[in-house]
Amino acid sequence: MSTHADSKPWTVPALAEAKRNGQKLVMLTAYDAGFARTFDANGVDLILIGDSLGMVVQGHDSTLPVTVADMVYHTRAVARVLQRALLVADLPFGADATPERALDASLQLLQAGAEMVKIEGAGFKVDIIRYLVEREIPVCAHLGLTPQSVLRLGGFKIQGRGDAARQLVEDARAVAAAGASIMVLECVPTPVAAEVTAAVDVPTIGIGAGPQCDGQVLVLHDFLGLDSGHRRPKFVKDFLAEGGSVAGATRAYADAVRDGSFPDEQHAYAQ
């Protein structure tokens, strides 16, 4: 039940329009043509080539070993089959360390078929987001738990609690002002994610950030209940058990996001 015509490809301006219209956005990760084709045909609005592939595809303990070449390879595979969903690709660890490196990596990803790049964090990344946007490269920001910062954070932990909540809101305003088209909020308490969503004009896409975000994203392996070799986060729901097939699971997930039934309190974090 989407107000965006099923046959109409998503564009960057359409994402902002969706927020203005109160239309929830549905996002999933994909790393190959087969899953991407199924997601595209069953109601997914955005597909993310996540550097999560380092953990769920390559078997690493973090996303840090993923390279730009890895991202380009998977982006090409997915881009070949998409008809409707907008394709976002991560800038992997280190690729956004300087504006020049970020531009080079972004150009490679856009030439491979991505329509937007995702950058983790704020701070000096705000200037890099602005640098890319000024060069006509759409950017998705990523705040809260940023997996590329796992060494500094000491693990995969909830972010934005206590005094950190105010900083998260300020960071969200900063990346939006720099020109980010959308932003992912990961592992953030529901009230804080709701405050961020109300504070910015760009859509927020939650993953473990509660139901009041403007959309939701899950990792392919998590939403299908596949064993990725890592502890399953609280916010994950197995939609394959409900949907009975990958296509059915995709439709069930898309419907649950759009009608607001996912995520519920069981799949979110309190303050």
UniProtKB/Swiss-Prot annotation:
Positions bound to 3-methyl-2-oxobutanoate: D51, S52, D90, K118
Function field: Catalyzes the reversible reaction in which hydroxymethyl group from 5,10-methylenetetrahydrofolate is transferred onto alpha-ketoisovalerate to form ketopantoate.
The protein's assembly and partners: Homodecamer; pentamer of dimers.
Protein species of origin: Stenotrophomonas maltophilia (strain R551-3)
NCBIfam families membership: panB, PRK00311.1
Pathway in which the depicted protein is active: Cofactor biosynthesis; (R)-pantothenate biosynthesis; (R)-pantoate from 3-methyl-2-oxobutanoate: step 1/2
Subcellular locations according to the entry: Cytoplasm
Name of this protein: 3-methyl-2-oxobutanoate hydroxymethyltransferase
GO terms of molecular function: 3-methyl-2-oxobutanoate hydroxymethyltransferase activity; magnesium ion binding
